[in-house]
Curated annotation (Swiss-Prot):
The lineage of its organism: Eukaryota, Metazoa, Chordata, Craniata, Vertebrata. Residues 185-269, 366-391, 449-461, 483-488 are extracellular. Potassium channel subunit. Modulates channel activity by shifting the threshold and the half-maximal activation to more negative values. Keywords: Cell membrane, Glycoprotein, Ion channel, Ion transport, Membrane, Potassium, Potassium channel, Potassium transport, Transmembrane, Transmembrane helix, Transport, Voltage-gated channel. Heteromultimer with KCNB1, KCNC1 and KCNF1. Does not form homomultimers. The gene is Kcnv2. This is Potassium voltage-gated channel subfamily V member 2. PANTHER family: POTASSIUM VOLTAGE-GATED CHANNEL SUBFAMILY V MEMBER 2, VOLTAGE-GATED POTASSIUM CHANNEL. It is found in: Cell membrane. Residues 1-34 are annotated as: Disordered. It comes from Mus musculus (Mouse).
């Protein structure tokens, strides 16, 4: 019983409420209530059961027996205040007329310029929906609060909603099944369902599965875009600096200097200096391990500072990194977010080993001076303590290699790689689990067939772990290999398992990395363009060029006059 019209209703005219003069709806008098719900039988299809809940006058109301009637089933109650306000606005134009609607068998609605005729008995099957409440309402005030507008002459209720989605709602009222189209936006569709009060549970299982998959995929994509946008932009909002009472504007300028390289020329120079000091520190760390450099440092030259030049370079780099970390710490408006940042943790790890090394060296020198004149029995204890301190110092020096991670603050690729690992932690975890299971299984199998071979290297399962790890990774150093036929069969299976295992997640990780990298690069480019717009580099260059041209023109004019 569908009736649609493509004519748009451009003007809304409010006319006195009168009984519609139609052939389908007889006039039964103004004081007579219209029966919205007729005697209803059992539902068919998805309308499983209807249980009578209460009776008011001559009208029988039915409540759906929902399984999950929680907050979602009571959401329509939150709109009562807005509906009452809308009803008061429309009722004020209908003062002096009867508040009791006439009895009707059909309901005429206009949604987005398209007209529909619906049976009231069909709408009454779903009294919790908006149209069901409209059909079962016994007062004009209640009906006017449920629609956007009403035309009394044609007895038509107007709704400013999407007609494409309402076509599915109309089919739901007539057939009892809510279908979902793939071209509809999941969020818009859910918003329309929430407005009309229709539950998603009325959709078929096939449509619901596809819809939930698209909704979850959309939510995941939006979440990833928000995280990537947050990484591309500054970590702190500018509104946090405005509410500060303690040097708010100064701290904001300092934060822009440290976190926004394209906000000013000084910020760009600061970013370049940070990367330069990181590279110098890494090169100095590598040169410090060269034997010739150590030999020259031990010989030294008499009468000067015994420290080699590489140690001075190290101290200079640590001083710069310390100053940078303190400036970031002093300018941040949110200490908790600053402490949770992985890049700030990398900055702390870059400078902490140097100060711990100085502290341990101070304790070692004091211990040596204290035990200089001690008896001989304390010499072994002192040597052991110094040896342990030396091992700790070597570990501390090795931790300086983590300074290379400071480049991630200004490297889009490194940040995209870290973001990929965080998003794919489940796939990476499964990969590590499969590798561990393969190492344990194949090492035990090879040990069981190779441990009796004379001169074998598979003396225990622990020794076979190295062979299994090298074989699964398809590296194959050749330092350990099975000699029996059964052992070689296990080796072949181990290598084949490693090839299959390593090939599965590579494509997934690469596709996600390339996707995240391109999106992060786009967000960074947008942020850079915005920051450069604030700095106005082109305006400055144009102004400088105009000044130079004006000066040259003035000089040429002066020469011509002379």
């Amino acid at each position: 019983m569908l009736k649609q019209s493509n004519e748009r209703r451009w003007s809304l005219s409010y006319k006195p409420w009168s009984t519609p003069e139609t052939e389908d709806v007889p006039n039964t008098g103004s004081n007579q209530h219209r029966r919205s719900i007729c005697s209803l039988g059992a539902r068919t299809g998805s309308q499983a059961s209807i249980a009578p809940q209460w009776t008011e006058g001559n009208y029988n109301y039915y409540i759906e027996e929902d399984e999950d009637c929680g907050e979602e089933g009571e959401d329509w109650k939150d709109d009562l205040a807005e509906e009452n306000q809308k009803a008061e606005c429309l009722t004020s134009l209908l003062d002096g007329h009867n508040d009791t609607p006439a009895q009707m068998s059909t309901l005429k609605v206009n949604v987005g310029g398209h007209s529909y005729l619906l049976e009231c008995c069909e709408l009454a099957n779903y009294p919790k929906t908006r149209l069901g409440r409209l059909a079962t309402s016994t007062t004009r005030r209640g009906q006017l609060g449920l629609c956007d507008d009403y035309e009394a002459q044609t007895d038509e209720y107007f709704f400013d909603r999407d007609p494409a989605v309402f076509q599915l709602i109309y089919n739901f009222y007539t057939s009892g099944v809510l279908l979902v189209r793939d071209e509809l936006c999941p969020r818009s569709f859910l918003e329309e369902l929430g407005y009309w009060g229709v539950r998603l549970k009325y959709t078929p299982r096939c449509c619901r599965i596809c819809f939930e998959e698209r909704r979850d995929e959309l939510s995941e994509q939006l979440k990833i875009q928000r995280e990537l946008r947050a990484q591309a932009q500054a970590e702190e909002a500018e509104e946090l600096f405005r509410d500060m009472r303690f040097y708010g504007p100064q701290r904001q300028r300092l934060w822009n200097l440290m976190e926004k390289p394209f906000s000013s020329v000084a910020a760009k120079a600061m970013g370049v200096a940070t990367n330069l000091f990181v590279l110098i520190s890494v090169v100095a760390l590598a040169l410090n391990t060269v034997e010739e450099m150590q030999h020259q440092a031990e010989q030294g030259t008499g009468g000067g500072d015994p420290r080699p030049i590489l140690e001075h370079v190290e101290m200079l780099c640590v001083a710069f990194f310390t100053l940078e970390f303190l400036l970031r710490l002093a300018s941040t408006p949110n200490l908790q977010r600053f402490a949770r940042s992985a890049l700030n943790l990398v900055d702390l790890v870059a400078i902490l080993p140097f100060y711990l090394q100085l502290l341990l060296e101070c304790f070692t020198s004091e211990d040596q001076r204290h035990n200089k004149d001690s008896p001989r029995e304390h010499d072994l204890e002192t040597v052991g303590r110094v040896g342990k301190v030396g091992q700790v110092l070597r570990i501390m020096r090795l931790m300086r290699i983590f300074r290379i991670l400071k480049l991630a603050r200004h490297s889009t690729g490194l940040r995209a790689f870290g973001f990929t690992l965080r998003q794919c932690y489940q796939q990476v975890g499964c990969l590590m689990l499969f590798i561990t299971m393969g190492i344990f299984s194949f090492s035990a199998a090879v040990y069981s067939v190779e441990h009796d071979v004379p001169g074998t290297n598979f003396t225990s399962i622990l020794h076979a772990w190295w062979w299994a790890a090298v074989s699964i990774s398809t590296v194959g150093y050749g330092d350990m290999y099975p000699e029996t036929h059964l052992g070689r069969l296990f080796a072949f299976l181990c290598i084949a398992f490693g090839i299959i295992l390593n090939g599965m997640p590579i494509s997934i990780l690469y596709n996600k990395f390339s996707d995240y990298y391109s999106k992060l690069k786009a967000y960074e480019y947008t942020a850079i363009r915005r920051e450069r717009g604030k700095v106005n580099f082109m305006q400055r260059a144009t102004k400088k060029m105009a000044e130079c041209l004006s000066e040259s023109h003035a000089q040429s004019t002066t020469r011509q006059e002379n």
